[in-house]
C-alpha cells in the first residue's frame, strides 16, 4: 500500500500536495503496538470544501477486528464536530457502506487521474451535503 506504486494512484496525487488534517487523522494501538492509522486531507470539489479519507491501513494480523471501521468512524465524528459536511474516498463500496459511504455518482467528481467511478464514494456528514456538488477534486 505504501510502496513506490502509490505515486501512480490517483488519490495519492492529491495527498502529495496537501498535508492531512492531524486533528481528523488517527492511529490505533494495541498495547505499545501501532496497528492502524488513517488520514483526512482537506480538499475542494469544485468550490465545495470537503475531506478526502485515506489511506486507511491496519496491520494484517489485526484485520477483521473492527479497527479500520473504528478509525473511519472516529474521523467522521471528528470532522462532523469540526463543522465538516462531506467526506469522499476512493475505495471498496461494500466495506465503506456500513460507515455511511455511497457512490458519489459517475462524472460528479473529477479526480486528477484514472479511477473506477464506482470506487468514488461519499459520506454526507450533513444531510444533503452532496447535492449540487460537482467538479475537480483538488487539495485545499
What is each stretch, according to the model?
Residues 62, 66-74, 84:
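Conserved acetyl-CoA pyrophosphate-binding loop and the N-cap/start of the following alpha-helix
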Residues 31-32, 61-62, 124-129:
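Short loop segments at secondary-structure junctions
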Amino acid at each position: 500500500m505504501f510502496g513506490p506504486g502509490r505515486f501512480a494512484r490517483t488519490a495519492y496525487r492529491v495527498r502529495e500536495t496537501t498535508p492531512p488534517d492531524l486533528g481528523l487523522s488517527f492511529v490505533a494501538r494495541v498495547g505499545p503496538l501501532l496497528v492502524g492509522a488513517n488520514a483526512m486531507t482537506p480538499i475542494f470539489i469544485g468550490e465545495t470544501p470537503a475531506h478526502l479519507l485515506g489511506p486507511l491501513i491496519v496491520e494484517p494480523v489485526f484485520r477483521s477486528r473492527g479497527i479500520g471501521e473504528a478509525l473511519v468512524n472516529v474521523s467522521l465524528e471528528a470532522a462532523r464536530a469540526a463543522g465538516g459536511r462531506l467526506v469522499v474516498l476512493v475505495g471498496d463500496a461494500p466495506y465503506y457502506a456500513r460507515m455511511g459511504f455511497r457512490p458519489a455518482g459517475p462524472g460528479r467528481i473529477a479526480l486528477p487521474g484514472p479511477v473506477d467511478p464506482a470506487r468514488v464514494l461519499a459520506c454526507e456528514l450533513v444531510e444533503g451535503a452532496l447535492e449540487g456538488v460537482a467538479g475537480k477534486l483538488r487539495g485545499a
